[in-house]
Amino acid sequence: MCIRDSIYAALLKIAEMAFNVSTIHEAGYICSMLFIIPGFPFITSGIDLAKLDLRSGLERLAYAIIIVMVATMFAWIMALLLQLKPMDFEDLDLGPVLHLILRLIMSFFGVFGFSIMFNSPASMAATAALIGAIANSLRLELVDLTGMPAPAAAFAGALTAGLLASFIKENNGYPRISLTVPSIVIMVPGLYLYRAIYNFGIMALSDAVSWFASAIMIIIALPLGLIFARILTDKTFRYCT
């Protein structure tokens, strides 16, 4: 993580000197760390707890929390050393149609990458990526176009991913979990978690609590969306054994 942030800061400084790139782009260092946030155990822990598999659920949740705390703490320390700040991103001067198309494309490749990291075959990764592109773009469009709160939009996106995965499972036999979890890992609010810890570190407690509360709500909403989709499409999942 130290190497990653140092490389980003060095490349940004070179870009500033060589190409007069604005310092507003230093906010992009946050994006370089988001893949470290353990979305898979966060989401699967919620599914395990819904099935009353408490041991697996609590173990995965504890593991995810430990990784998040270590990752965000180190990122905060490196941000202080390199004088990086998690500023807001600049608004994109794009039309709504082009913005949606780019979201679909970027979401596809983001989910595809996560799925490959989970050792999925290319065909399964592409299927999960297609689901994720639709679900994540829906989530973002709901927030931007309707003003829906981010947790509610995350629930809608996860529910959509779960329903699509269930439909595809019936036709090609891919394991449901191999499609649903990678497709919504991209929705895990790593940015919110990092900003919460950063603001705690600089004692901006009001901002820290706000970011942390938003992150918790989204983290809860994501597995809930998958759980509701599973309840609607899988009769055996509706009952405890």
Predicted regions and their residues:
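C-terminal transmembrane helix-loop-helix hairpin of multi-pass membrane proteins
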Residues: 28-33, 44-46, 50-68, 130, ...
